Amino acid sequence: MSYLFTSESVSEGHPDKVADQISDALLDEFLAYDKNSKVACETLVTTGQVVLAGEVKSSAYVDVQEVARGVIEKIGYTKSEYQFEAKSCGVFSSIHEQSGDINRGVERADPYEQGAGDQGMMFGYATNETENYMPLALDLSHSLLWELAKIRKEEPDLMPYLRPDAKSQVTIEYDDNGKPLRIDTIVVSTQHDEFIGPKGISQKEADEAMQKRIALDVKKILIPRVKAQYPAHVQALFNDNIIYHVNPTGKFVIGGPHGDTGLTGRKIIVDTYGGKGAHGGGAFSGKDPSKVDRSAAYAARHIAKNMVAAGVADEMLVQVSYAIGVAKPMNIFVNTFGRAKVNMTDGEIAAKIWDIFDMRPKAIEERLKLRNPIYFETASYGHMGRKPQTVTKTFSSRYLQKPVTCDVELFTWEKLDYADKIKDVFGL
């Protein structure tokens, strides 16, 4: 019997994502000037106010106000009527030094014996239902909001009323074998300007006219653009019977941090697999790679994606766990959901992963090049399923004479650089 599965995403202007992006921008700034920085930075955003808190060990000085305001401006909160605006909002910082008790458990004379920054379990997941080995419902949800933001920033005349805050949700019907059959429902809620109608009509009538315009634009402008980004077999899932809910409350003028308080780390399912697979509970943003909540989750995704791409299974979940101060993981667990393509148990597959991948924190950092300022880009539209690329970044501050320019690789955990080795090990 078929079933329905739903995933959601939120835009870069969603308050929780504003917080995530500020935290990761601060992390990047510290790493740009000191690659050995230890950072755990949390952000709260609300009406007209940003609050920064956390622990840092670094030789770098970062102008946290400058960084936070730059992120807010980049997202698009640049008008006073938003009641959260880059130049005028308050920025309060309570960032202090990292605990010595934690640091003694992490740093070692032999870097490869560097202990995990905390205990916990982390998961990586991959499925071959999309070209980027991500669950389709989540991938579509991200694409809807990525394209909406692109229209807002690059083609404002198309949908001139758009504001930064938005959410999406996609429901897909699957068959018993986990194959997508059709898109059932699409939900898009986007913040918009107040609509002032011509004289002689009420505000209610003006709101209804605005709602009608937004719904039409989503169906006629946004959906076709997103559909065109996918291969033919995914395009075929779009159909005339899709249920659309566009701004279902009828109005979405008050939004962003003025509408809801935002906090770092509250969109961990959006950040990962949209409810597919599993999650260990640890958030990513604002954490340097000594925190295995982040680095080991990326490494587990790297394993799962390369294993599925190599043909070991059509779907795979990988769990890894750590004790604080201990380098070697407690375990590696694999679940192929009965979709393995090799004549092995999941336990036997996990045993081979131990032989292929060094999962000590320092080895992960080096393999995935995680000591670079690569994190701001991860903080919106998902940490997984993104395209690996090399970019040039420049960091500058009014307090430092020379800017820092560096070439960095983004989303290294999405590279299929171990697929051939896996094929050799598994005889594929």
From Swiss-Prot:
Keywords, sorted A to Z? ATP-binding, Cytoplasm, Magnesium, Metal-binding, Nucleotide-binding, One-carbon metabolism, Potassium, Transferase
Species the sequence originates in: Parabacteroides distasonis (strain ATCC 8503 / DSM 20701 / CIP 104284 / JCM 5825 / NCTC 11152)
Q: Name the cystine pairs.
A: none
Essential cofactor(s): Mg(2+); K(+)
Q: Give binding positions for ATP.
A: 14, 165-167, 251-252, 260, 266-267, 283, 287
Q: In which pathway does it act?
A: Amino-acid biosynthesis; S-adenosyl-L-methionine biosynthesis; S-adenosyl-L-methionine from L-methionine: step 1/1
Which reaction is this enzyme known to catalyze? Answer: L-methionine + ATP + H2O = S-adenosyl-L-methionine + phosphate + diphosphate
Q: Which family does it belong to?
A: Belongs to the AdoMet synthase family.
| EC identifiers of the protein | 2.5.1.6
The record's section on SUPFAM superfamilies has: S-adenosylmethionine synthetase (SSF55973)
TM segment ranges: none
Gene encoding it? metK
Q: Provide one Gene Ontology biological process annotation.
A: S-adenosylmethionine biosynthetic process
| Cellular location(s) | Cytoplasm
Subunit (UniProt): Homotetramer; dimer of dimers.
Annotated stretches, region: Flexible loop: 98-108
The protein's job, in short, is:
Catalyzes the formation of S-adenosylmethionine (AdoMet) from methionine and ATP. The overall synthetic reaction is composed of two sequential steps, AdoMet formation and the subsequent tripolyphosphate hydrolysis which occurs prior to release of AdoMet from the enzyme.
Q: Which domain of life is it from?
A: Bacteria
Protein name from the UniProt record: S-adenosylmethionine synthase
**The keyword Metal-binding appears for this protein:** yes
GO-annotated molecular function? ATP binding; magnesium ion binding; methionine adenosyltransferase activity
Q: Where does K(+) bind?
A: 42
UniProt binding sites for L-methionine: 55, 98, 260, 291
The cross-references to InterPro entries, in alphabetical order and at most eight, read:
ADOMET_SYNTHASE_CS (IPR022631), S-AdoMet_synt_C (IPR022630), S-AdoMet_synt_central (IPR022629), S-AdoMet_synt_N (IPR022628), S-AdoMet_synthetase (IPR002133), S-AdoMet_synthetase_sfam (IPR022636)
Q: Which GO terms describe its cellular component?
A: cytoplasm
EC class name = transferase
* Pfam families referenced in this protein's UniProt entry, alphabetically: S-AdoMet_synt_C, S-AdoMet_synt_M, S-AdoMet_synt_N
